[in-house]
């Protein structure tokens, strides 16, 4: 295929997201090759799948390419500690804590639950924090099942940009977050316990700053206001609950959430500002 045709193909949001994903898989796979060769082979398979999704013309590669960024995001998030180890990166919590004190005068993740020691508030905020997980998949999939391919492709690209930016920062300048450093005073309850159990099973140490939860939720909110405004209003509320709930529960520093929100705004705004070739 001529170079001009390839460039034209990658001007589409769908194919650009797949190219970005393939590039990330290539770099991170090389970093993991020496210590985790099987994982590196899985990355190579992911690159091949993304390439197939870009250049394949039948229904199967098109569908796989459409959904691939959504499917692999949780897996790549789980690899973050391995990348930190491969790079030998040190944690930067002391620096982030200085920013926290400069901005707030104290550590919100330590004091917010003591200011609002109400079990009902605690359960609401932890429920809001857990709403992040459906917020990853529901907005784009609603567009997909309705056949709104342009909105779907742009939404998935915004999500992919947010995730890749976060994963790179996590690997190079990891931050543990307050969950590993002190015990919060959030009131106990079933939703609180469920949240803690999910994080214990699936969170990645070093992936606190910027908050990928906040970056993705805010990016999804901005994209939803463009393509499905009623859902955008709901996601705006979810974004607030994710931001406050993460700090209230002692999972993130306040500046993690601010940085994540700004990142989400930037990537979603950039996607909406670009004039895309909707063929890809």
Where are these regions (language model features)?
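Membrane-interface loops
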Residues: 75, 81-113, 145-231, 276
